[in-house]
């Protein structure tokens, strides 16, 4: 039973860590998780997938420019009418790491390289305390 596993118990903290560490927005990360589950997709499928997310005109180009979405097959105007995309290896590794952290196979990093642990703001200190609490919880 998924409820007894408590898979989403610490999802918010893990999501905020991933977004802060990799300079993503919450909607970007959730959209990348969605497309990682789909596999291959077109630009039109991307447009259909973004209807439920906040409007961001530059999201597509930003995700491509930063290497989160890559071309799987290029359009050639004769036999392939459109370009097919997929999430990059970097993106799939991030999503796999999020799953491992949620399942308790891996802890959130607490080294000084972590922007949140090393941060000086109040929200960073609160998040750092939450990260330590997540790492202590071995029943996640």
Q: What are these language model-derived features?
A:
Residues 64-77:
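A short, conserved structural fragment
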Residues 30-37:
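Short, locally clustered residues in the helix-turn-helix/winged-helix DNA-binding domain
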């Amino acid at each position: 039973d998924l409820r007894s596993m408590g898979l989403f118990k610490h999802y918010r903290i893990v999501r905020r860590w991933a977004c802060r560490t990799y300079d993503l927005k919450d909607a970007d990360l959730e959209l990348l998780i969605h497309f990682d589950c789909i596999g291959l997709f077109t630009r039109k499928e991307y447009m259909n997938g973004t209807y439920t997310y906040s409007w961001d005109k530059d999201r597509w180009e930003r995700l491509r420019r930063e290497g989160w979405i890559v071309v799987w097959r290029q359009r050639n105007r004769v036999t392939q009418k459109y370009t097919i995309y997929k999430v990059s290896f970097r993106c799939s590794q991030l999503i796999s790491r999020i799953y491992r952290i949620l399942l308790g196979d891996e802890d959130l990093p607490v080294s000084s390289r972590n922007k949140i642990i090393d941060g000086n703001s109040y929200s960073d200190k609160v998040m750092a305390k939450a990260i330590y609490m997540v790492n202590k919880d071995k029943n996640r």
